[in-house]
Design a protein with these regions (language model features):
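NAD(P)+-binding Rossmann beta1-loop-alpha1 motif at the extreme N-terminus of oxidoreductases
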Residues: 1-60, 64-67, 93, 98
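A short acidic, helix-capping loop that chelates divalent metal ions and anchors anionic groups
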Residues: 41, 75, 130-133
Length: 156
């Protein structure tokens, strides 16, 4: 399936995020990536992604922003902090966090996204890096139905 024309921001290109972003690049999406560990971005950039300079940078022009990050504190910083993705995203865009985080912090992000007119999906994954490389992770998404419908082609 071609994802050509889809503008995606991706935050977190570690062991799982990097191969997940590669799948979108391989299917034709225009992907900008950011990771505070700059070395983590090299594989995605080699695959065709644009290296972003910050969370805000990769979210500024994206219709969809994905994050795959380690914990609650990082989610707060990425989504809600100074220069966070929600401050850069346009109303009508969709933020998808694919990390395993607490319901409380995810709820904080959901409330802020809703107030900004941004769809927010909680979409943790099940599977290994091998499955991520093959594009065969199980995604357990919840959130607004319209946001899910728009993201479904990207999940496949």
């Amino acid at each position: 399936m071609s994802l050509e024309g889809n503008k995606v921001g991706w935050v977190g290109t570690g062991n799982m995020g990097s191969p997940m972003s590669h799948c979108l690049i391989g299917d034709g999406a225009s992907v900008a990536v950011f990771d505070p560990a700059a070395d983590n971005m090299s594989a995605a950039v080699s695959a065709g992604a644009r290296a972003g300079s910050s969370n805000h940078d990769v979210a500024a022009d994206a219709e969809f922003v994905f994050s795959m990050i380690p914990d609650d504190d990082v989610l707060r910083a990425v989504a809600l902090g100074d220069g966070g993705v929600l401050s850069a995203m346009s109303p009508g865009s969709v933020y998808v966090d694919m990390s395993t985080v607490s319901p409380e912090v995810s709820g904080e992000v959901a409330a802020a996204a809703d107030a900004a007119g941004i769809g927010y999906l909680r979409a943790p994954v099940s599977g290994s890096t091998i499955l991520a490389e093959a594009g065969n992770l199980t995604i357990m998404a919840s959130g607004p139905e319209d946001a899910y419908g728009r993201c479904e082609p990207l999940f496949e």
